[in-house]
Each structure stands twice: as structure tokens, then as C-alpha cells.
Amino acid sequence: MYKILRKKVLNPTVTLMDVEAPLVAKKAEPGQFIILRVDENGERIPLTVADFDREAGTITIIFQIVGSTTEKLNRLEEGDYIHDFVGPLGVSSHTEGLKKVAVVGGGVGCAIAYPIAKKLHNLGAEVHSIIGFRNKDLVILEDEFNSVSDVLEVMTDDGSHGTKGLVTNALLGLIEEGHNYDEVIAIGPLVMMKFVCKLTKEYGIPTVVSMNPIMIDGTGMCGGCRLTVGGQTKFACVDGPDFDGHLVDFDEAIERSSMYRGFERQKHEETCNLFKKEVE
């Protein structure tokens, strides 16, 4: 059992939790993930390590409420326990040797991008961060990114905060200003990553993306997280989650990601209705 030490609501649909998990924290690195079960009968869901504190023995997770399991997780409070918390899993993000990097995060993907930007900053790299959201109410981790970035661009679709536009608009602007990046790291919605990669390919900039498809066992056995990368089948849980963005078949990944969306929406609505009845 893993105790929740801190809970913070970042926006109406995104929550941060610090979880007591010393063995996981001891080995965690940016880019890796954990798989948890809220209770004994719960489903297994993957969540990327948003931060870690080896001395305190804690792992920070940030999740968006999108289905019944994340709804159930969000109902837990400080002092409550998560039944299973397995990790760290996956291959950590490559950060060594990079001198100038653009880190691009979209929505809740910023939770994955932040620890990478933080490590790059700590290694002495020049970090240009671009974070994008639909509107000001959905902005998360702005202060955290500001503390580890030499340049920070905040974009919103409607212009209610930061600059109006897409993350690709900001990235193109920085490239056209003459910034030569060793690498671009893009993490967020599949469509966003697809178009970031399309842009960087035109300029010949190496680009890494973090792929977070459906996962079940986290060992590559189930095949649920399979992707096509460079014409070959890869598994996000053991081969990733980071991949060369110019080799990822995004159209296939987008199609696969929508397979269970209707079912997830239905379960989310059922859970919400059940919770309302319990309250009543």
C-alpha cells in the first residue's frame, strides 16, 4: 500500500499527488512511468513520473480525469492509500550531451515534459520551453517550467493567457529567430506531436516524442501498447516511451488511441452517476 502525502488540484480536470514510494523514487528517472491500481479490484493504468524526491522517498504523479479509474483515484485524499504502485518502468529519457534543447509540452503532457526540462537544466543545457493549453483555466506547471527554462513560451488556443496560437507557431518563431537546437522534445496530444515532428523534419532537427498508448502489463507481453516506428513494431512500455518522432506512424497511433474512447466515456459517466447516488 502506498500513502498519498500530498494532493493538489492543478485545474478542473488535472490533479497532482505525491505518493510515498521510496523504492520507486530511489531508481526513478525522467521519462519513466509507473503502473498503479487504486484498489484490489481496480484496473492497471500507467502514469508518467512527473517528479521524484529520492531523500523523501516520494514520486509525484499528475493525471487527467478521463475515465472511471482516474475518477476513483481523484476521490482519494491525503492520508489515503493506493493499492499497487509499480515502477519505475520504461527507458529513461536521453538528456546527456545536449547543449540546447526545445521542450514542447501540450496539456497534461506538460507533466511528462517538466522533469525532462528540469534535468536538462540541472545538466547545464540551455532549455527553451513551449507549453500549450486550450485556455487559461487549463494552464499547469507554468512556474515550474519558468524556474528551469532560459526561454518560456506559454500558448493558449484562445489567447486568454500567454500568446494566442499553437505550440508549433512558437517553435517556428524560435527557429526562424536563428536558434539551432540539438534536439526538440515534444510531449502531448498525438496530433500536436505529429505536427511538431512535421515542422522539425523540414528543418532537420532531431526530435523525440513520448508515446503513451494503452498499457496493461507494462512488460510487453500483452501488446496493447504496440506502435509502428520506422516500419517496425515497438512496444511503448519496454522500448519507450521515447521514440524518434520522425519515424513514428502517428496516423496509426491516432487511430488506435480512439478504439476504446466510447467505452471509456461510458464507464466514466457510469462512475460519476454512481458517485452522485452515493452522495445522495
Identify the function of each model-found stretch.
Residues I112, L190, P213-D242, E270-F275:
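Local cysteine-cluster metal-coordination motifs and their immediate loop/turn environment
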Residues F235-D239, F243-E280:
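Short Fe-S-cluster ligation motifs
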Residues M1-E78:
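Ferredoxin-reductase
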Residues E71-I216:
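FNR/FR-type flavoprotein reductase catalytic core
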Residues R6, D51, V154-T156, V209, ...:
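Structural signal for conserved beta-strand scaffold positions within catalytic alpha/beta enzyme cores
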Residues G42-D51, L89-K99, C237:
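Short, Lys/Arg- and Gly-enriched loop/turn segments at beta-strand edges
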Residues L36, D84-F85, L227:
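A generic structural signal for residues embedded in beta-strands
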